[in-house]
Amino acid sequence: MKLVAYPLAVLFAGGLIFAAAMLTAGEASAQQEAVTGAVSGEAIQKVGFRAMIQKQAIMYDLAGYARNVPDGTVSISLQGDKNRIDKALAAIRVGSKKSSRNNVVTAVSAPLDSTLKTFTVYGWTSTSRNITNPYDLVFQLRPASDEISKKEAAAVWNTIAESTLKGDDLDKFKKHLGDED
């Protein structure tokens, strides 16, 4: 009896461990969410607002995009961990030093895109640096999907900008490196 009971107990325990792992994986994917929407406020264009949004995406390892819209709003899409999206949306509502405060974010659920592994600011320019050529700044999601600090996110963002900008625009950017965007 002992010879049969032990292998069955080991098999049962292994099954429990496998089931727990599957539940954990299921919970992780259940926390994944995608939202799309618009941000409105008094001053959210030409003040580094989309760069601030991208830095939030870098901090929280979120995919998506930020794009200026001719009506003065900013179109956004965020995809990733629900709690991290909530933190990013809270920061977007608050704004940055140069942007308006108490911004209105209208975001709705969107379908998850399992192939989306980047966050892009489309058509980035910098009024304060006199960079008028538009650039698409692309952040690649980290393999570990960990959160990083605001300072680390700023360093990553600077690296993205430095690797994307060309010629005089790159020189202008480097001259003002460390300025808030």
Give short role names for the model-derived ranges.
Residues 1-5:
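Positively charged n-region of N-terminal signal peptides that target proteins for export
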Residues 7-181:
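Intrinsically disordered, low-complexity, mixed-charge
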